């Protein structure tokens, strides 16, 4: 699948943005310690770097990334590239002022900027795919699923790194919205591309089954106080795999409208 690097780039990027957001909000609400926030920011930065490296495989040559920046302001893809770069830059600056230079004010400002540009980056992604020539993508469901990854995958990662209340809330809200809108999404695709959408049933089924299982697993683990990093890590991995499966289905829907 030629778009596989984009699958990882978008899902991991949205997951990292969600993790930054939920961790920072948890810290401000007194639900996360300074040390936990520091570890979470490191993890989120690593995830975003992995996303960029894998996404770069789709571009091919690294210098092509800079060519993409020439269309900033008029090209959604250029805007996405720019915002991803700014997102990573502020993430790096946050760690710089937290771990090395240790300036609390600058660290705080960079952390806020990281959250803001993470959200801007997530916003820019569906702008690339909401194009009239691809009827299967030209829908509000394209935008919706990108934001839901931020909630469910970002929420799962947030639970793993200590932001359990907001993480669980984000995962729950995102999962409910996914289940509530899936029938309408499939109905829409039944009109725009019935054959190609039918071929994605396996990917969507895997996604929904995993999310459904996690809706039972997370309450059981958190209610009983079983905060084993191994178990929560496996849960987060399962959720990310579910979102990757759903994103593969999304990219498989590509077809030019005649």
Language-model regions, residue ranges each:
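Hydrophobic alpha-helical segments of integral membrane proteins
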Residues: 17-22, 27, 55, 95, ...
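Long, contiguous internal "core" modules enriched in hydrophobic/ aromatic residues
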Residues: 3, 10-12, 31, 38, ...
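Membrane-interface helix-loop junctions at the exits of transmembrane helices
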Residues: 55-59, 186-187, 246, 252
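Hydrophobic/aromatic-lined pockets within catalytic cores
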Residues: 26, 162, 249
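Short, strongly hydrophobic alpha-helical membrane anchors
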Residues: 1-4, 258
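Membrane helical hairpin/interfacial module
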Residues: 15, 19-86, 90
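Juxtamembrane boundary at the C-terminal end of a transmembrane helix
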Residues: 241-258
């Amino acid at each position: 699948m030629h778009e596989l690097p984009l699958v990882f780039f978008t899902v991991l990027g949205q997951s990292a943005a969600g993790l930054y957001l939920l961790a920072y909000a948890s810290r401000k609400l007194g639900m996360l310690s300074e040390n936990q926030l520091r570890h979470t920011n490191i993890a989120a930065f690593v995830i975003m770097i992995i996303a960029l490296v894998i996404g770069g495989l789709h571009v091919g040559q690294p210098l092509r990334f800079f060519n993409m920046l020439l269309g900033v302001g008029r090209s959604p893809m250029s805007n996405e590239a720019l915002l991803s770069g700014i997102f990573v830059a502020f993430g790096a600056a946050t760690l710089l002022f937290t771990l090395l230079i240790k300036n609390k004010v600058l660290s705080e400002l960079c952390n806020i900027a990281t959250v803001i540009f993470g959200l801007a980056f997530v916003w820019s992604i569906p702008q690339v795919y909401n194009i009239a020539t691809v009827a299967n993508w030209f829908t509000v469901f394209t935008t919706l699923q990108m934001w839901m990854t931020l909630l469910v995958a970002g929420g799962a990662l947030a639970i793993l790194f200590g932001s359990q209340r907001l993480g669980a809330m984000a995962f729950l809200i995102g999962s409910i919205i996914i289940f509530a809108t899936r029938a309408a999404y499939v109905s829409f695709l039944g009109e725009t591309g019935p054959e190609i959408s039918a071929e994605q049933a396996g990917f969507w089924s895997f996604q929904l089954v995993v999310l459904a299982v996690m809706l039972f697993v997370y309450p059981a683990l958190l209610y009983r106080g079983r905060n084993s990093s191994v178990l929560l890590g496996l849960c987060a991995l399962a959720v990310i795999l579910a979102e990757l499966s759903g994103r593969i289905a999304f990219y498989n829907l590509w077809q030019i409208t005649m």
